[in-house]
Amino acid sequence: MLNKIFYSLIKTIVYLIKYFKLDRFFFDKIIFNIGLKQLIENKKYYSEFTSLQQADLKIFSQNGEDGIIDYILHRLDIVSPNFVEIGVGNYRESNTRFLYNKVHPKGLIIDCEDNLKEKVKPHLNFWKGELKIQQDVITSNNINEILNDHCDFNIDLFSIDIDSVDYWVISKLKSNISKIFIAEFNPIFGPDLEVTVPNIDGFKRNEYHYSNLCYGMSLRALINLMNKKNYYFLGTNIQKMNAFF
């Protein structure tokens, strides 16, 4: 119940920011502090949780990934996780933004959005941590080269959400690339069928199919792929869009 109330509060604050064109940085501080307090409250019950979805809590993530990530890190006793996140947009809603604001670890974020650095920087206190911002279109052909060039640390948390050829990009990653792995899957494909879009250069979901719903991979395809890379499936968020390993 508290998580639902908190989620509604966050949505209301975001709406007010957009509608009245208010100072986002000021309200982001409010969201961060409220979210941190709720996370601390939730942590009291971590020992009683039997599924990831009980930890579901949205602060700066798109859905409830912030809470789930904190829960997994707590279980693994990781305090300051170095991370890579691919597919962050302008970083306002992402899986690692709250994490970076909270403990300021080393991080690398990658997206193809134009003027990425200019869009990301206003939202963060860069002097407190080491965050690299790389503007690139990620494919199965360049993923390892980009990581080799820009990631000079051991990865604790890896997250990918590019609404594209995610399956094929993941397939090129080395096994056990990180302690925690998060990937978006396409719930439209259903939970049982092993489905992915073809590995097309320059794939764009709005051009591949008129519905704009054909992208990524099914949950089953993702689980089977991650099993080959020695990962264990932990579960999904409540919205059943992100899988955790």
Predicted regions and their residues:
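SAM cofactor-binding core of SAM-dependent methyltransferases
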Residues: 56-149, 153
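Conserved acidic-Pro-Pro-aromatic motif
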Residues: 82-85, 98, 104-106, 150-160, ...
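Membrane-proximal basic amphipathic "stem/tether" segments
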Residues: 1-54
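Short hydrophobic/aromatic-rich motifs at helix boundaries and adjacent loops
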Residues: 37-43, 68, 192-196
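A short alpha-helix capping/helix-coil boundary motif
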Residues: 49, 74-75, 200-203
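Short, hydrophobic/amphipathic alpha-helical patches that form generic packing surfaces
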Residues: 32-37, 71, 223-225
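Short amphipathic alpha-helical segments, especially helix-boundary/capping motifs
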Residues: 41-48, 94, 196-200
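A structural signal for well-ordered alpha-helical scaffolds and beta->alpha junctions
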Residues: 6, 62-66, 92, 140, ...
